[in-house]
């Protein structure tokens, strides 16, 4: 399966903000964007005025990178959001937030979304008591996620939990760090999600 192999720190610099792709490093002063907050490359510091299309495209790329989706995957999520009732852009973000890999990350079971995807594929996560190994699986209110018994001693998961304790857990989730399990209480409201994302630009881009 195709995947984005570009260095994660370069991806953050390309978007001009932290996308939190590298776990603990993103919360330290070792994060390159703290020292070089401009696009990578020979002409990275040169300021250019972007067209409306370029602004829309950059926003789409930023969201894709945050959630770790390829173009076809992202477009399929958008199509699903567009078919739902309500505001398409908000539907899009709620679907992305409801992916199993994203929820596992937000609960602290992975230091990054990429790591959460990996532990899911390695059968380290249970959904409602049953093995779940599809990172893109959508979950809903009342669903319970927990670390499988055999994986609770893994150093990477223990490290992820310690990192999660230093950052806030989203209000729509409930986490029991002692037993490594969590509850998806309800779907998030738009006000609960990142204010640095402008999903309306993605809607404008795909509406052309």
UniProtKB/Swiss-Prot annotation:
A Gene Ontology term for the protein's cellular component: small ribosomal subunit
Xref: Pfam families: Ribosomal_S4, S4
One of the record's GO molecular function terms: structural constituent of ribosome
Keywords, alphabetical: Ribonucleoprotein, Ribosomal protein, RNA-binding, rRNA-binding
Boundaries of every S4 RNA-binding domain copy: 98-160
Coiled coil, from the record: none
Domain of life, source organism: Bacteria
Gene3D superfamilies: Ribosomal Protein S4 Delta 41, Chain A, domain 1, RNA-binding S4 domain
BP GO annotations: ribosomal small subunit biogenesis; translation
Subunit structure: Part of the 30S ribosomal subunit. Contacts protein S5. The interaction surface between S4 and S5 is involved in control of translational fidelity.
Family from the record: Belongs to the universal ribosomal protein uS4 family.
Function: One of the primary rRNA binding proteins, it binds directly to 16S rRNA where it nucleates assembly of the body of the 30S subunit.
Protein name in UniProt: Small ribosomal subunit protein uS4
The organism of origin for this protein: Nitrosomonas eutropha (strain DSM 101675 / C91 / Nm57)
Name of the gene this protein is made from: rpsD
